[in-house]
């Protein structure tokens, strides 16, 4: 009997939240944060349908950060994949990369590739 009560208590879905920090490219005016937000709203699939976020997934924008909050399960790898796809579509994938900025891996950051290191290696 106690088993059923434990299952009912665990029935609550925990929400996950991921943040994409785009401050460096937005400050340099390489990309617009609004276009990334729109891209994510159109492309995130919920229940096999793209663009139908409903109440389960919400996307918010604050200055140069986008926060994706999901009520149920949401893959961090999927968010990284979509961000890379956006960068490729806007021809900035050669200069920017998506990396996890903290240990919990719920904060992604768009950073520039270190081109200075590559130029130093080519000179040798």
UniProtKB/Swiss-Prot annotation:
UniProt KW Protease keyword: no
Q: What GO molecular function terms would the record report? A: mRNA binding; structural constituent of ribosome
Q: Pfam families under this entry? A: Ribosomal_L22e (PF01776)
Q: Could you provide one GO biological process annotation from this protein's UniProt record?
A: translation
Q: Which InterPro entries match?
A: Ribosomal_eL22 (IPR002671), Ribosomal_eL22_sf (IPR038526)
Keywords (alphabetical) are:
Ribonucleoprotein, Ribosomal protein
Give me the Gene Ontology terms describing cellular component: cytosolic large ribosomal subunit; nucleolus; plastid
The record's family statement is: Belongs to the eukaryotic ribosomal protein eL22 family.
Protein name (Swiss-Prot/TrEMBL): Large ribosomal subunit protein eL22y
Q: Which organism is it from?
A: Arabidopsis thaliana
């Amino acid at each position: 009997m106690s088993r059923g009560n434990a299952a009912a208590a665990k029935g609550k879905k925990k929400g996950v939240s991921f943040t994409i920090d785009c401050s460096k490219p937005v400050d340099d005016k390489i990309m617009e944060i609004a276009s990334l937000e729109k891209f994510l709203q159109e492309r995130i699939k919920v229940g096999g349908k793209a663009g139908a976020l409903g109440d389960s997934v919400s996307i918010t924008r604050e200055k140069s950060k986008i926060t994706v909050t999901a009520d149920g399960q949401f893959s961090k790898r999927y968010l990284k994949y979509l961000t890379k796809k956006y960068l490729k579509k806007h021809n900035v994938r050669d200069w920017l990369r998506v990396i996890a900025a903290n240990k919990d891996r719920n904060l992604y950051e768009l950073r520039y590739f270190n081109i200075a290191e590559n130029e130093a290696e080519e000179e040798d």
